[in-house]
C-alpha cells in the first residue's frame, strides 16, 4: 500500500485522521483536506487502497471491504496508530463503515462524504453485471466520457479548469502501462461494491458519525443498465442523507445544497471548515 503520513503543522492535538478515498479517486485527491486537518493539529494518514493508484494491483485477489479494512488496520498498526478518526468519501464511505464495524474500539469518530451504499442497489432491482462485463467497460474508459460523467455527477453540471487534473489522473491509470491490470482490478472492485452492501448495518455504528452530503449527487452503481422504473428511484442523495442519518444511533447530517458527489473538491474551503468545526466539538 502506498500512503501519505502527514504530521500536524504547529501544535499537535494528539488526534489522528485516516482518509479513505473513493473508487475513481486516489489519496492525492484529499490534498486540501489533508492540509486543513494538518494545520488544525491532526496527524493525517491517507493510503491508496490495494488495487488503486500507487498501490499494488494484483492479478488474483479476493476483494472485500473486510480485506481492505484489514489492510488499513495493519498499516495503522505498523505506524503505531492506536486510536483514529475515520473519514471516507464515496466508496471510501462504504469502507469506512466496514472499518468502524470491525474496529469500533479504535474509531473515535466516523465521517463520510457522499458515501455510496446509502441504499442496497441489488435489493432495489439493479441488474447484476459480471466481472468480465465490468472489465470490458473499464477498458473503454476515455477522457471525454470521464469528464462528462464527473461534470454531471461530481459537480452538478459545473466545471472548473482545476478539475481536469483528476480526469487525467484517472484516465492516465486506465490508458498507461499496466492499464489491463488497472481495468481488471477495477472490475473486481465494482463487483465488491455491488455485492457487499453496508446499508443494513448502519444501525450498528456506535461512534459519533457525520454524513456530509452534496444533495445534487445521483451516484448509483449499475444505474446505467437499470430499468427506467428502477433507475428513477436510485441515487437521490437529498432523500438518502436524512434517511441514513436517522438509522445511525449517533448520526448527524450536514447538507451542501446544490453540490454533487465531491463537495471537498468543489468547495474545499467551506468543506474543510465544516469538517474541522465538527471534529472540534
Where are these regions (language model features)?
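Helix-loop "lid/cap" segments that line or gate small-molecule binding pockets
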Residues: 146-160, 171-174, 186-191
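Flexible "cap/lid" loop of the alpha/beta hydrolase fold
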Residues: 97-101, 108-141
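Active-site loop/oxyanion-hole signature of alpha/beta-hydrolase fold enzymes
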Residues: 6, 39, 49-87, 91, ...
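Structural signature of beta-strand start/N-cap positions in the alpha/beta core
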Residues: 16, 41-43, 82-85, 106-109, ...
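Conserved catalytic-core motifs of eukaryotic protein kinase domains, centered on the activation segment
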Residues: 29-31, 55-61, 121-124, 222-223
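Conserved serine/cysteine hydrolase catalytic core
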Residues: 175-246
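Catalytic active-site module of serine/aspartate enzymes centered on a nucleophile-bearing elbow/loop
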Residues: 238-281
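Conserved HGGG/HGGXW glycine-rich cap/lid loop of the alpha/beta-hydrolase fold
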Residues: 2-54, 274
Amino acid at each position: 500500500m502506498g500512503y501519505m503520513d502527514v504530521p500536524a503543522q504547529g501544535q499537535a492535538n494528539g488526534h489522528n485522521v485516516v482518509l479513505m478515498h473513493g473508487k475513481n479517486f486516489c489519496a492525492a485527491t484529499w490534498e486540501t483536506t489533508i492540509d486543513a486537518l494538518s494545520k488544525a493539529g491532526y496527524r493525517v494518514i491517507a493510503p491508496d487502497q490495494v488495487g488503486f493508484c500507487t498501490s499494488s494491483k494484483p492479478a488474483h485477489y479476493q476483494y472485500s471491504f473486510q480485506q481492505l479494512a484489514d489492510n488499513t488496520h495493519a498499516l495503522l498498526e505498523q505506524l503505531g496508530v492506536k486510536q483514529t478518526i475515520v473519514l471516507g468519501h464515496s466508496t471510501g464511505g462504504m469502507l469506512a463503515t466496514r472499518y468502524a464495524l470491525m474496529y469500533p474500539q479504535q474509531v473515535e469518530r466516523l465521517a463520510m462524504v457522499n458515501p455510496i451504499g446509502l441504499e442496497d442497489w441489488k435489493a432495489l432491482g439493479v441488474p447484476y453485471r459480471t466481472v468480465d462485463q465490468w472489465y470490458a467497460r473499464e477498458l473503454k474508459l476515455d477522457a471525454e466520457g470521464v469528464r462528462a460523467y464527473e461534470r454531471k455527477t461530481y459537480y452538478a453540471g459545473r466545471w472548473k479548469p482545476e478539475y481536469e487534473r483528476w480526469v487525467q489522473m484517472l484516465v492516465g491509470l486506465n490508458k498507461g502501462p499496466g492499464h489491463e491490470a488497472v481495468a481488471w482490478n477495477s472490475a473486481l472492485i465494482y463487483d465488491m461494491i455491488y455485492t457487499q452492501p453496508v446499508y443494513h448495518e448502519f444501525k450498528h455504528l456506535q461512534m459519533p458519525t457525520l454524513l456530509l452530503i452534496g444533495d445534487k449527487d445521483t451516484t448509483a452503481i449499475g444505474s446505467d443498465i437499470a430499468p427506467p422504473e428502477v433507475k428513477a428511484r436510485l441515487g437521490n442523495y437529498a432523500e438518502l442523507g436524512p434517511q441514513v442519518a436517522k438509522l445511525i444511533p449517533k448520526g448527524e447530517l450536514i447538507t451542501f445544497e446544490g453540490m454533487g458527489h465531491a463537495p471537498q473538491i468543489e468547495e474545499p474551503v467551506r468543506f474543510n471548515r465544516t469538517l474541522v468545526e465538527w471534529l472540534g466539538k
